[in-house]
Amino acid sequence: MKIVDLVCSKARTGFFFDDQRAIKKGAVSDGAAYFGETVTPGFKSVRQAGEAISVMLILEDGQIAWGDCAAVQYSGAGGRDPLFLAEDFIPIIEKYIKSELVGKEADSFKGLCEMLENIQVDGKRLHTAIRYGVSQDRKSVV
């Protein structure tokens, strides 16, 4: 089955992104919220809505396969990948992954995973959330 397009959509996760370093430096908990200054790059507040990217593969017969690129609660802490904001990472998916998939046969899950593991942006592997989500949509096709 040939992939004819790749579409990205900003989504929400089922939980929050928390700036763990700010919490450890004394951000005050007030129920479901935290008050204090952010410490980790990319955070606009100590606790903010979790974001994801739904990646949809449009197949030649009209079927749509999808996967959700989602990161962990404490992004950017303890050696984890940076905060996963859709506006920052949709352009990366569109630039580096779309061209690798559109026009190709969706016939090898292993091949997709190898391709994803080998893509580098500025000398770094793709964000874990991208590798996770894009492999989900391909798995639903193969």
Region locations from a protein language model:
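Metal- or metallocofactor-binding catalytic centers and their adjacent structured scaffolds
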Residues: 58-142
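Short, Gly/Pro- and small/polar-rich lid/capping loops
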Residues: 1-56
